[in-house]
Amino acid sequence: MIRLPLLKRPRRNRKSAAVRSIIQETQLCSSDLIWPIFLKDGSGIREEIKSMPGVYRWSLDMVSKELERLCTIGLKAVILFPVIDANKKEQFGSYASHPYNIVCKGIQAIKKSFPELCVISDIALDPFTTSGHDGIFHNNYVINDESVRVYGGIAVMHAEMGADIVAPSDMMDGRVKHIREQMDQMGFVNTGILSYSAKYASALYGPFRDALSSHLQSGDKRTYQMDPANVQEALLECQLDEEEGADMVMIKPAGFYLDVIVKARENTHLPVVAYQVSGEFSMIMAACLHGWLNKESVIKESLLAIKRAGATAIISYATPWVLEWLAKDALPFERSVL
């Protein structure tokens, strides 16, 4: 047998699963994951979203059953998105400020049944407006300051309902500062802010808009969401949000923007949350459903890459499956009787 005179053989550290596990640099844990939930008024609802295989719109009674199951296998956090009936939408998205909308009811119900679960509420107007824009849309433009004023009121209301963290996703200037001031004035000094700091004007949001039945009627979101070509701008947005009082920053999307996650991690001491968005998820699922990729392997790898880039936590539609896989992986090795 030929033996080369090699002093360095990196393969020695890959020779078995046990050896590989003790030197693994990045590990995916259940506490890394945040489950995004689409909530809908009604009962007995579990509607699969056609463009997002395996993802559902839920009524509160049905999602409570799923949460009970997922909490037993390690779920720590959820983020809530509302599916609003068309007859409740109008130009200004006023129903977003209604204390009995599905987000408010969802926060209250989930915190009552699962008090240890971290509940994050999305702050934006696009599910509630007829325009499909994230703010007040007038003369083909989203009005910044008036929209920010509305977000402050919504954030206070969500805090009153029991949200642990509010997450403004609108990309308006100054909204973190205004929300922090409004919540502090009302006594909600311990309610956190997860700011969508670098939210890109990506082509990957289509399935999400299908899920919410929220589509742009005119214009586009490039006047407030970020240019996919830019990274220094993302660092500026993260810096401004940190200065305004954000407790966490977010990069969205995640998989196409790993370089942004890396730089954000290098430039802030705040937690960096990454959002594996609907388009990323649906592309992976399309390949899996065609038999081209292994679902468990590719989803785990996609999330591991995001964490390796520097993400503290990851919002992913695959969270329920990943929790199951991680629970399975954690089972003890079978041992032979000595």
Swiss-Prot record:
The active site is at 199 (schiff-base intermediate with substrate), 252 (schiff-base intermediate with substrate). Mg(2+) binds at residue 237. InterPro entries: ALAD, ALAD_AS, Aldolase_TIM. It holds the Pfam family ALAD. Pathway: Porphyrin-containing compound metabolism; protoporphyrin-IX biosynthesis; coproporphyrinogen-III from 5-aminolevulinate: step 1/4. GO terms for cellular component: cytosol. Coiled coil: none annotated. 5-aminolevulinate 1 binds at residues 209, 221. Signal peptide: none annotated. The keyword Electron transport does not apply. The keyword Lipid metabolism does not apply. It is an enzyme of class 4 (lyase). NCBIfam families: PRK09283.1 (NF006762). This is Delta-aminolevulinic acid dehydratase.
